[in-house]
Design a protein with these regions (language model features):
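Proteolytic processing hotspots in large secreted/extracellular or virion-associated proteins
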Residues: 348-359, 385-431
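Solvent-exposed loop/turn segments flanking beta-strands in beta-repeat/beta-sandwich domains
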Residues: 244-253, 425-427, 489-504
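Exoplasmic/lumenal beta-rich domain surfaces
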Residues: 105-140, 214-224, 251, 258-314, ...
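Surface-exposed, short loops/turns at beta-strand junctions within beta-sandwich domains
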Residues: 312-317, 456-458, 524-532
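Surface-exposed, glycine-biased beta-strand/turn segments
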Residues: 19-106, 112-116, 132-141, 146-147, ...
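Short beta-strand elements
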Residues: 331-348, 549-555
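Proteolytic-maturation and junctional protease-sensitive modules
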Residues: 405-459, 497-499, 506-507
Length: 555
């Protein structure tokens, strides 16, 4: 137990090591330096997504600006600096990193294109390497920008649910994502208080009980609610914040739990690392933010007392609890409830599954045909899972690692044995597939000594599959409207690469996730107008199957 207290104390010191003072002017004082940024858009700023908002498997790493429901708005650099990375990606569309001399790097995602200078640099790289999706790292003296220079156009590219601009801000030295909101506070109006929509009590396994039961108890946050309990009990809250000009729900910046007037636990969603971004399940369960630290929770956003924020009910009296929600503007809501101490027998915890995963040690789970190697610190606390093996006549049995998909705090290794031999050379076409609501999805994998091995981030349902089918190419346009357009898909291992050629010369087909369509706009700079041209499209999937489409068109 003492070792855990030392770890917690160290984390608290780390969290306090970079003080930041913000005010409504938008200037932020960090380590005695005053840092300011200008807006990336020239329209009134309205947030559609806040920093640290809950996503299915992670936290939102930046803020989303509404763009009036339109694409194509100019996007500007928020400060002097240089373009350090350029991405054209399936997930984020056109994306650029700008490194600033003040210690921060800004990222602009989901754009439909770059400014002419950045676009020309990108196109030269793409044509030189004959690729569409790319990641380019630049030197400080290659593409410099000034504050307010246009760098791109807002869009709806990649994993986007509507037109917006996503802005990330991270510390250049260590990569920690930082909330950009304090730098733009003067551009927002916020008089609305954060709201709680539910409170949940978590009796701890083998040491806590509520109303004679060991089940979690949820209730609407009405002041004066009384819950009878005994032993060690955790508190969680489901909450949202709002701004005046938007109906969007945002995350709450500050949450605190007080018991009998003393602070037990607090969270400040100010920054997190890429590693911490995978730790959502250590802090959040069914959208309830736990106001206590699980043993495996290493997130620095949380500060807890020596009891990890847990309420220790060991007297037959009322324990007065208060949850305080506060936003950056000082808007605050308070919710009071009582845990009434009633002595009850706490039953010994008996895990319901057939496998127990320990949070603080390496776990090796072996069953015939499968092995899972889970490093330590990959689960928040000791976790009981129910592993099932479903017999199959396929390439492997089906392995259900838990009754429902369970997120890990990182990745682990999964090995599945091949039951039936495949033709020599086809081992490279094998992959591990994960079951999802949309069907079976490839998780990749490599063949080694009769097993396929890959990394997974959740305890779901898996099996082996083989992909002998090349990508499917469907033609949408062969020169009509001065464009070449196709839909290229691969339902097995997934599409890895694609290249188009007109009269033997590479042309850039850009793939857009929203429509799953790739398109090339014919240009006289690359294709001579007038006459018949030969076109070739080559698509390759992730296990090496190749599709080739050839045709001629008049333009």
């Amino acid at each position: 137990m003492k070792k855990w207290y030392l770890i917690a104390a160290t984390l608290l010191l780390q969290m306090q090591s970079v003080p930041a003072i913000h005010n409504k002017s938008g200037n932020v004082k960090v380590c005695r330096k005053v840092i300011s940024f200008t807006p990336p858009l020239r329209i009134p700023l309205i947030l559609s997504g806040s920093f640290g908002e809950l996503r299915p498997s992670h936290f939102h790493g930046g803020i989303d600006f509404k763009t009036d429901g339109k694409t194509g708005l100019p996007v500007y650099s928020i400060a002097d600096g240089y373009v350090s990375k350029i991405f054209v990606s399936y997930g984020s569309g056109y994306m650029v990193h700008i490194t600033h001399p003040n210690g921060y790097t800004s990222i602009y995602r989901h754009m439909i294109g770059f400014s002419p200078v950045i676009m020309n640099y990108t196109l030269n790289y793409q044509y030189r390497h004959q690729i569409d999706q790319c990641e380019i790292t630049l030197k400080p003296n290659e593409l410099r920008v000034r504050q307010g220079d246009q760098i791109g156009f807002s869009g709806n590219e990649g994993f986007s649910m509507g037109p917006h601009l996503h802005l990330d801000l991270y510390r250049t030295d260590n990569g920690d994502f930082v909330d950009p909101t304090p730098f733009f506070m003067s551009h927002f109006k916020d008089t609305r208080k954060p709201q709680a929509t539910g409170i949940r009590l978590f009796p701890q396994h083998g040491t806590g009980i509520i109303g004679g039961r060991t089940d979690q108890v949820s209730f609407y946050p009405a002041n004066g609610k009384i819950i009878k309990g005994w032993g060690w009990i955790g508190v969680g809250v489901k909450c949202h914040d709002y701004q005046d000009a938007s109906y969007s729900q945002h995350g709450v910046r500050y949450v605190s739990l007080y018991v009998d007037g003393k602070l037990k636990c607090s969270t400040n969603m100010a920054c997190f690392s890429r590693t911490e971004n995978l730790m959502k399940s250590a802090w959040v369960e069914n959208d309830f933010e736990k106001m206590y630290r699980e043993p495996g929770n290493r997130m620095r956003i949380m500060k807890a007392d020596p009891q990890r924020g847990l309420v220790f009910v060991n007297q037959e009296r009322d324990y007065k609890c208060q949850l305080v929600l506060r936003d950056l503007y000082g808007n605050e809501s308070k919710y009071n409830f009582v845990i009434r101490g009633r002595k009850q027998t706490v039953p010994q915890w008996k895990f319901s599954g057939n496998v127990l995963i320990h949070w603080n040690r390496i776990n090796i789970i072996s069953r015939p045909g499968v092995q899972v190697i889970i490093p330590k610190l990959m689960v928040p606390n000791d976790l009981s899972i129910h592993l099932q093996v479903h017999a199959s006549t396929g390439l492997s049995d089906v392995y259900q690692l838990d009754n429902q998909p369970t997120l890990l705090l990182g990745s682990c290794e999964l090995q599945i044995r091949l039951k039936h031999p495949v033709p020599q050379g086809d081992e490279r076409k094998l992959y591990i597939a994960s079951q999802s609501p949309m069907g079976w999805k490839s998780c990749g994998g490599i063949y080694r000594n009769g097993f396929i091995i890959t990394k997974i981030e959740k305890l779901g349902t898996y099996k082996l599959m083989i992909d002998n089918t090349p990508p499917k190419i469907s033609v949408l346009s062969m020169g009509a409207g001065s464009r070449l357009a196709f839909i290229v898909g691969d339902s097995g291992s997934g599409l890895r690469s694609y290249r188009g050629f007109v009269d033997g010369k590479f042309v850039l087909l850009h793939l857009r996730r929203q429509s799953n369509k790739m398109e090339y706009k014919l240009s006289e700079a690359q294709v001579k107008r007038g006459g018949i041209h030969k076109f070739e499209l080559i698509a390759v999937d992730n296990v090496g199957n190749v599709s080739t489409y050839k045709n001629s068109f008049r333009w």
